């Protein structure tokens, strides 16, 4: 069976937000195929090189929240430059809420734990962070913050005496940095913008409104039931009102969306609004 194109998968995800009667009519009008079968979706997930390039840091974390060693091994190559998440995968650190037991590490994991920084060996977790004077040192020291207990320790240390700026920044751009700890590092609008540039989002709703191209976000969302089922509903709830208002049951608007999806440079909300306006 021929695999659906990126545009078909992306529009198909949005089409899943309307009622079945409308979806059937739109497919008949636009020629969109039926939704992927579970087997097709699983096959596409295993071909991570087709969707995981430039994977946003928060999306990588949401995938890791499944505590699935095979998924962890898949995303290993595509996790952003911060080595903290890679170290966590290599050590079997769990990320699902409430889980404390370590995970088995998949035999297909394509790499080893990053080197432990010398400053950590000499000074321990907080001591290494307090010694930071460069960006590189900050990233290295922050990569040793792995568990919930580690984050609690770091947050308490920063409240007692603020950590160096480079250390704070390296911790702040970790997608697994707890909101309570991140709040202590500052809430300036410029700071929030830099977090988004680093691929760190407070929620799935923020992710759907992130910078374009929209097809990049929609393709990842189209695999959300397998990659991050616990986060998908929030993304769907953020997009559904836009879909209802600007596309709804208008077959012509959906036809325009199909034409625009592959080449549109704006983000997902802008794509939806534009398709409705053009039609």
Task: Give, region by region, the residue ranges found by the protein language model.
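Alpha-helical scaffold segments
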Residues: 1-279
């Amino acid at each position: 069976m021929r695999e659906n194109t990126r545009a078909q998968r992306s529009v198909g995800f949005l089409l899943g937000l309307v009622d079945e009667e409308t979806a059937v009519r739109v497919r008949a009008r636009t020629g969109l195929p039926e939704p992927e079968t579970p087997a097709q979706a699983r096959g596409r997930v295993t071909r991570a090189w087709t969707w995981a390039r430039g994977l946003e840091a928060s999306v990588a974390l949401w995938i890791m929240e499944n505590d699935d060693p095979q998924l962890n091994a898949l995303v290993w190559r595509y996790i952003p430059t911060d080595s903290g998440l890679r170290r966590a995968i290599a050590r079997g650190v769990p990320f699902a809420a409430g889980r404390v037991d370590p995970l088995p590490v998949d035999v297909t994991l394509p790499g080893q734990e990053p080197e432990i920084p010398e400053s950590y060996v000499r000074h321990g977790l907080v001591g290494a962070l307090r010694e930071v004077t460069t960006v590189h040192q900050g990233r290295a020291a922050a990569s040793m913050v792995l568990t919930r207990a580690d984050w609690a320790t770091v947050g308490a240390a920063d409240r007692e005496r603020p950590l160096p700026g480079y250390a704070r920044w390296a911790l702040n751009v970790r997608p697994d940095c707890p909101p309570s700890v991140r709040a202590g590092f500052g809430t300036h609008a410029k700071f929030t913008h830099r977090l988004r540039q680093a691929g760190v989002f407070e929620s799935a709703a923020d992710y759907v409104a992130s910078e374009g191209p929209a097809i990049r976000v929609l393709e990842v969302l189209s695999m959300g039931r397998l990659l991050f089922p616990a986060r998908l509903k929030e993304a769907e709830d953020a997009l559904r009102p836009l879909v209802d208002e600007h596309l709804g049951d208008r077959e012509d608007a959906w036809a325009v969306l199909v034409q625009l999806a592959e080449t549109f440079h704006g983000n997902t909300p802008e794509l939806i609004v534009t398709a409705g306006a053009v039609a």
